[in-house]
Amino acid sequence: MTTILKGLPKGEKVGIAFSGGLDTSAALLWMKQKGARCFAYTANLGQPDESDYDEIPRKAMSFGAEKARLVDCRTQLVHEGIAAIQSGAFHISTGGATYFNTTPLGRAVTGTMLVAAMKEDGVNIWGDGSTYKGNDIERFYRYGLLTNPNLKIYKPWLDQQFIDELGGRAEMSAFLTANGFDYKMSAEKAYSTDSNLLGATHEAKDLENLNSGIRIVNPIMGVPFWREDCVVKPETVVVRFEEGQPVALNGQTFTDPVALFLEANAIGGRHGLGMCDQIENRIIEAKSRGIYEAPGMALLHIAYERLLTGIHNEDTIEQYRINGLRLGRLLYQGRWFDSQALMLRETAQRWVASAITGEVTLELRRGNDYSLLNTESPNLTYQPERLSMEKVEDAAFTPADRIGQLTMRNLDITDTRTKLKLYSETGLLTGSEGAQIFQLGHDKG
């Protein structure tokens, strides 16, 4: 069954994810004039650069929407963000700086909650502003059809008639002006920005060039810590978790997770914490580049992983990291609610996050520069007396115990020595000149 419509379905209800910007404003008016019954849906994701959400539905009505709804997605977004922290669902990193998958998390929430709202209104055709080269077109496609199996997709930016008539920002602005709307294009930035309560993404235009870096970005969730005139003072922060849930910051307990995240963003943002520059593979395997902000996610992630390493054993931590890499990629691909992702999430939340209770004290400085000052938890398995260099009573083990443990190592040491001898005899390994160390041999071909 065809789910993607190449032309505008005239006379039918069409839902559009409406941001109030130039693109969706022009698209809504154009679809209305061409005969579609337009329904506008706006997701309140707590975007830090959006000042008046209530104005957006009113604007949609003025452009010809039969109905316009504002859907509050903030609580669900924070819920998914915390789940990502609990399961370590982050697969993109460079030099220790992590991208916290904030855009994929936002798409998972938007794609399900807006389509659910459309379904309530009997709207089974959905349009949004994603382009065919990006990740979002596939993410929204998957989440939309998961939520409404009868959904059909109409995207103005895949409709050749729309492209021919309104193919650029100048054409769209002129179209709105010609129809009596005093729409002035905002000044062109050197890059594009997309944001939600969890984080911000800066990409495209000048940022497609790798010789343009973070210094051309004007942060919307933090401070430009790289500038000499940007004053950033060290700050001590205490983060508390209970059974994997962040519950308190600097002694203030939060019952509303959205309020907690807003405060975490404010704290981390004062230092530029969580900003990073990444080259990544899009879903279609072509590489793209983005500069990201996520001050609250970064703060909570640091504290969570500090408790994690003090509470769980090595094998559990290793499995958490392996599963997190896989889960992060599934999230990025728009598969956050697929069964394989739910399995990995539930495993981490049940067996890892449930034990994460305690407080972490940090000193934040500039950017991602911080120090861990204290870690407290009733569940810590870190017990310094076990390995103390001082003489202790009731030692966990004795010199004789260690002799026995080392003697058992002779079994695998003997096996390894035998293998190295075999590799040397076949020429795979050669002894390095002047040293008793093995090196890989050259191809004998």
Swiss-Prot record:
Molecular function per GO: argininosuccinate synthase activity; ATP binding; protein homodimerization activity
The reaction(s) this protein catalyses: L-citrulline + L-aspartate + ATP = 2-(N(omega)-L-arginino)succinate + AMP + diphosphate + H(+)
Binding site for L-citrulline: 99, 135, 139, 192, 201, 203, 280
Major location category of this protein: cytoplasm
This enzyme's EC code(s): 6.3.4.5
Residues the entry annotates as binding ATP: 17-25, 43, 129, 131, 136, 194
Metabolic or biological pathway: Amino-acid biosynthesis; L-arginine biosynthesis; L-arginine from L-ornithine and carbamoyl phosphate: step 2/3
Keywords, alphabetical: Amino-acid biosynthesis, Arginine biosynthesis, ATP-binding, Cytoplasm, Ligase, Nucleotide-binding
GO-annotated cellular components: cytoplasm
Gene Ontology process terms (BP): argininosuccinate metabolic process; L-arginine biosynthetic process; urea cycle
Residue ranges of the TM segments: none
Top EC class, one word: ligase
Binding-site residues for L-aspartate, renumbered to this chain: 131, 135-136
One Pfam family from the record: Arginosuc_syn_C
Record localization: Cytoplasm
Ribosomal protein listed as a keyword: no
Family the UniProt entry places it in: Belongs to the argininosuccinate synthase family. Type 2 subfamily.
NCBIfam families listed in its UniProt record: argG, PRK05370.1
Quaternary context: Homotetramer.
Protein's name in the database: Argininosuccinate synthase
